[in-house]
Swiss-Prot record:
This is Melanopsin. Residues 1-71, 128-143, 209-237, 317-328 are extracellular. It comes from Phodopus sungorus (Striped hairy-footed hamster). GO terms for cellular component: axon; dendrite; membrane; perikaryon; plasma membrane. The gene is OPN4. The chain crosses the membrane at residues 72-92, 107-127, 144-164, 188-208, 238-258, 296-316, 329-349. Residues 93-106, 165-187, 259-295, 350-469 are cytoplasmic. It is found in: Cell membrane; Cell projection, Axon; Cell projection, Dendrite; Perikaryon.
Amino acid sequence: MDSPPGPTAPPGLTQGPSFMASTTLHSHWNSTQKVSTRAQLLAVSPTASGPEAAAWVPFPTVDVPDHAHYILGTVILLVGLTGMLGNLTVIYTFCRSRSLRTPANMLIINLAVSDFLMSFTQAPVFFASSLYKKWLFGETGCEFYAFCGAVLGITSMITLTAIALDRYLVITRPLATIGMGSKRRTALVLLGIWLYALAWSLPPFFGWSAYVPEGLLTSCSWDYVTFTPQVRAYTMLLFCFVFFLPLLVIIFCYISIFRAIRETGRACEGWSESPQRRRQWHRLQSEWKMAKVALIVILLFVLSWAPYSTVALVAFAGYSHILTPYMSSVPAVIAKASAIHNPIVYAITHPKYRAAIAQHLPCLGVLLGVSSQRNRPSLSYRSTHRSTLSSQSSDLSWISAPKRQESLGSESEVGWTDTEATAVWGAAQPASGQSSCGQNLEDGMVKAPSSPQAKGQLPSLDLGMQDAP
């Protein structure tokens, strides 16, 4: 009886001695820590034997035109430069602007830091290796490169989850946010995010999976190709706890946010217009717009990582033999491009960020088309913030004196946004009747200018991306 045929080469590639990776490149990669991984990789190649077998890797470098390396290298270079400059701008602007320097926005700064480091550590190495059409930095360099990509990618995903949770609590459970917005607690959240990312990125150094070359052998990642229980267990848990579970949390948060806003709008329909209700509606609009900005960033991040995740899941399912070098390298570049979305989205849709750029980076503000009349966010923030605090001292009279003093002191210390402070009062009102709409937000919001169109009708909740008033 004939024995079953062995695995075949990926489509479009020839199999034979050229299926082996460069002996020079991998001669330093024979450490004992990779014995199990290398042994499994050998089983995929029926022609590998002897010294060549120890150097074999899952993706060949033959039959790949030079221009493929150069194109990928050029793209990753542009992505890296854009990511570094854009995220540096976000970090600088958020740190310089008083109106943006809030504990909640520390999550955005953390996202910008992780995206900047992703561009800084990944793009130059990928670009240099693409120019030479091979990996240049040895086994240690490969492990460090892949480790940085893993920890920074996980940090970004968990930070986006924390941003979604923050928006969820502010809009749907405002009373729960009293005292939770301090700088110390935010710092603990950020520390937890980085420790969580490290916990999932370190196991390959201790024998649970491994960091190996991938695609065109000009970049590295965790080993998702080897079909062993150990490697597959790591891949499965990694996807569950750093991708699918955070994604489910984000979906839950935004469904809850949308339902809360819709129910608030319905509760306020049919009642006579009042200045308090207009202020409530404007603040609800502003908070919803900020939530939409975060949602856009999250969606772009997930879409960027979706192709790469699909490739890894195909290999996890046991179909790694259908993967070609292009099917691994191109999704890897798309995933690394997730680092450029954050600054672009904020430059287009975040009104306070645009105004802060015009103030602190006037040349960039001109490019964004921001009017010079909006170049003083700090001054308006101080005025509005003082008004909010003074008004809350009377409007929050339903809270006992010690707790009220604690709440106001906490807000003054950590710099709550107007909407977050307003939400505390709004959530404490009855859930039905005219009082739920007419008395929800009698704190110190600057009175909105009246207009003939506004006197007899409650403004509808704007779901567009126009600037908040």
